[in-house]
């Protein structure tokens, strides 16, 4: 598979913006036309706990110290296209893209703020899943111990170092890992968004040389 570049994402997002503008114009003139927007939810509106399978939940918790990384990967990068709501196309600048379901397209946001939102919401989901599986006796004692240690570490504000890199705290270290994870998965996320657009009956408007299989 050839790499999907940022130009392709901008092409896709422009189609979403055009659709949104067209929908608003028709509503304002009382000409109601059904516009099929991608079924993507804004950050924080995902019902992750009810969406993930028991197997996915178990797999996430079995990742132990990398459970939050695995959570973000499964939720935002894998098969749950409804949650393809954040895209990082550059590691160096301060910006990232987030989907705004009220607008119907992706908007630019502060990368650090978006990553903090993702981490906050997914940590809430992680703790909920941990409680759910723990109550159901689906977690072994070793995993329970390591997950508890991980959760405590995430709340620890002491500086954390990994290799030669110093971080303000462990949460900042994990946030950096998630940033790289999302960046490395930008091609799949972009392609899956393109497929959602196709499901919305507007795939023919995307130049054929922009979606590469």
Regions found by a protein language model. Give the residues of each.
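Extended amphipathic coiled-coil helices
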Residues: 1-3, 8-213
């Amino acid at each position: 598979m050839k790499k999907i570049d940022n130009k392709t994402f901008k092409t896709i997002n422009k189609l979403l913006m055009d659709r949104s503008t067209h929908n608003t114009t028709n509503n304002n003139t009382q000409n109601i036309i059904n516009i099929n927007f991608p079924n993507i939810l804004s950050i924080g509106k995902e019902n992750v706990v009810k969406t993930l399978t028991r197997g996915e939940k178990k797999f996430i918790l079995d990742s132990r110290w990398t459970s939050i990384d695995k959570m973000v990967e499964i939720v935002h990068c894998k098969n749950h296209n409804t949650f393809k709501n954040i895209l990082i196309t550059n590691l160096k600048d301060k910006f990232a893209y987030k989907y705004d379901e009220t607008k119907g397209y992706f908007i630019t946001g502060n990368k650090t703020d978006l990553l903090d939102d993702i981490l906050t919401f997914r940590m809430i989901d992680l703790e909920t899943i941990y409680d759910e599986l723990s109550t159901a006796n689906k977690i072994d004692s070793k995993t329970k111990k390591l997950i508890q240690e991980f959760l405590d570490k995430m709340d620890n504000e002491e500086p954390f170092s990994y290799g030669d890199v110093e971080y303000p705290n462990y949460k900042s270290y994990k946030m950096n890992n998630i940033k790289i994870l999302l960046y490395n998965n930008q091609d799949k996320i972009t392609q899956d968004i393109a497929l959602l657009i196709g499901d919305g009956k507007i795939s023919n408007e995307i130049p054929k040389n922009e979606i590469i299989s």
